[in-house]
Amino acid sequence: TGVVVVFLEIGNEVKIVGDIYEAINEGVRQGYKEGYLRKSIVNHPFNRVNTKDNTPAIIHTKLVSGDKIKLKIASKGGGSENMSKVTMLTPAEGIEGVKKLVLDTIFNAGGRPCPPIIVGIGIGGNLEKSALLAKEAILRDLDDESDDDIINKLEKELYDEINELGVGPVGVGGKTTCLAVKINFYPMHIASLPVGINIQCHSSRHIEVIL
C-alpha cells in the first residue's frame, strides 16, 4: 500500500529512449495489480477519486556521472507520513532545539505512525530540501551510521531518548519506540536551521535497483 516514492539517479552517459517517468508509473500499475496491493492514491485534494492503479508515483530526479540508472523505491504509508513535519528553527536553537523538536514530534504522534518507527531527519538546505533529506534518510540501512562525528553522536542520543519516551510498539507502552534514527544534512542559509522529520512505520518497504 502507500504512495510510491522514487529517488531516480540517471548517469550522464545513459541514453534513454522513451519516457522514463511513464515507464516507472507503468511499473507501479503492474506491480500493484499483480501483487494485489491496495490502491491508495486519489486524484484531487477535495474530490478524492481513487486513480485505481496507485499512480502517479512521486519521482525525484538527479543527474550524476556514469553509465547507470539507480532507483531507490519506497512504498510510503499515510499514517506515518501524516505525523511527519518540517520546521524552520533559528540557528540559536541549535542541537538542543533539534532534539526537542524531534522528541516532541515522536511523543505527540503516539501510536499513530505504527511504532516501532524509523526516524529520518533532514537538517539544512531550505524548507523543501530538509524534507527530501529526511525522506532519503529513512531509506538508509539500519546499520548505516553517519561518518560525521556530530551527526553520529546526535543519531545515537536521539535513538536512546526516543526509546525512553515510553510510547512503545503500537503506542501501548514499552521500551522499543524507535528502531533507528538517521540524519542527513546539507549547507544552509546563515539565518536558517531547517529541520525535516520523516517518520517510517515498522513495515519499511523499500528497495534499491541499479540498471
Language-model features and meaning:
Residues 1-211:
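Non-transmembrane, aqueous-exposed alpha-helical and coiled segments at domain scale
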